[in-house]
Amino acid sequence: MLPPGASELATKIISELEVFVFNRDIRDFFSAFYQEDFLVKWPLLDVVSDNALETYLSTTWHCDGPMKGLLKCFLYLNPVSEHGCNTLIIDEVRTRKLQSVNALPLELERRHTDISAFLQTLGLPETPIEFDLCAGDLLIFAPHKLAHRCLPPRAGKMRYTVCFSVFPESAFKCQIS
């Protein structure tokens, strides 16, 4: 959470970093991935503090709601090695199996910080995918297809990221017949 009055600074940071993130190579990547133009929506300067288990909704395993073509892009502003607040991801095959046994509920109060028992019961590997991200690294994934959670930072540490939601342009076109 940002301190009160920080929204102007956050807006300035986001607008300056958006130009850096969506350089020609990244724009070409998204255009090729979607096979059409894309839109960047709802940029957010995200500050995760060491009390994240009590204050931050994404510390439990979940999939985002099914928004057609959504990719999340997290630009890490400080390295995971500094704060330990990594984004853990489960591959699509294991995610589908976890969904089939209701291990990834949409309701916040029913979500889990530990899904190892579900994975064991399903006979699946328990180790999530994680990256040793450095400042300036970009994590891109499909949050409606891949289970994920944010680990809370170590005591006294904070994670700073800018999150961008990227969609194919067609996701926002109304079709009138």
Could you describe each region identified by the protein language model?
Residues 36-40, 62-66, 77-86, 92-94:
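Active-site region of the double-stranded beta-helix
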Residues 54-59, 71-72, 83-91, 98-102, ...:
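A short secondary-structure junction signal
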Residues 83-146:
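Double-stranded beta-helix
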Residues 66-82, 133, 140, 164-168:
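Short, conserved beta-strand element in jelly-roll/cupin
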Residues 1-59:
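Non-heme Fe(II)-dependent double-stranded beta-helix
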Residues 58-65, 145-150:
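Histidine-centered catalytic micro-motifs
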Residues 102-103, 138-140, 145-177:
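Non-heme Fe(II)/2-oxoglutarate
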